[in-house]
Each structure stands twice: as structure tokens, then as C-alpha cells.
């Protein structure tokens, strides 16, 4: 039976971007059953004591620059340290992932495109026109009307799932993006992917909260 992983993330998160390809490689190698769960980070932070970047102490903001550069080089990914459209409102983009899944599409190509849009291409994923362009490149050529996905992303069903994802994240002890949850054990941050891989390959029981 495939190992199940709940993957909590937001498309505005540089850490989710830096870890996404590595996580998907881990999933493919190990035959993981991944459930994509986009979340509105502000909702999770508000409930779990996290702070948006602008409200963090300068020392924490400064340390972030070191880590971004370290992991950019470690992952060998293009990364604009001060992207033109960061921060921006990620909600419509996040809900586009939900709309794709609901319509039966694999969201991975869109997720990768959206991450690249923010972190290497200086494009605004809060702009519906940018999202429409990305969707058209993926879906229209395959004969599926991309406008249908964007309309669904802006609709009440996607909003309800998005809100439920945040509620489930909080209940699961998720505190940021990305988080990978294996059988109740939370791995917070793309820098924990080696530990997740160890847990999966060893087949060990999940560690518990004492």
C-alpha cells in the first residue's frame, strides 16, 4: 500500500518553492500518495503564533537572507531574493491548485509554474491574467478550457476547501509552509526532507507527541 503524505503549502512561500521538486522526486521514487493541501498562511499563523515576515524581529528577517542563499545554491534553483511581486495575495493562485485537483487534473505543472513565476520570473500570481496565461499554456493545448478552472478557483467550492485545508492544518499541528505530514508526524520545512525520506525508507512508526 502506498504511503500517504499530506502536503501543506502556499504558492507564495519561498521554502515551498525550494523544496517542491525535491519532494516530488521523493514521492515518485517511493510511490507516495500525495494529497496537495494549499493553505492561507495568515490563517495558520494567526492560530499557531506565527508572524508574517514584516512583523518578525529584524534579526529573524536578516537570518532569512542567509538561508535563502544557502538553499538556492543547495537546490541549484534560480531564486530572485527580492522578487518584484513579493509579498502578494496568493489566495487565487492557491485555490487554482484546488480547482485543478477538483477537475481531475494533476496540479504539479501549475504549481511549478506558479513558484517560478514568483521566485524567478517576477510575475504577479495575484493577477488573474497571469494565472490565466499559465493555465492556457497547460490546458488549452490539451483541449480543456482553462477559463473554467480560473472561474472555479474564484468560486465558493474552492474557497470552502481552502478554508477547510487551513482548519485541518491547524488540527494536524502544521505551523508553516511547507509541511509534510506522514501518519500524523509533521515535518516542517523543506530542510526536513531528508528526515522525511529516512522515515519513509526505514518504514519506522511515526514519532508521537508526548
Residue ranges and their predicted role:
Residues 3-6, 12-32, 102-105, 109, ...:
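C-terminal cap of thioredoxin/glutaredoxin-like
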Residues 11, 17-118, 207:
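Structural alpha/beta surface segment adjacent to cysteine/selenocysteine redox centers
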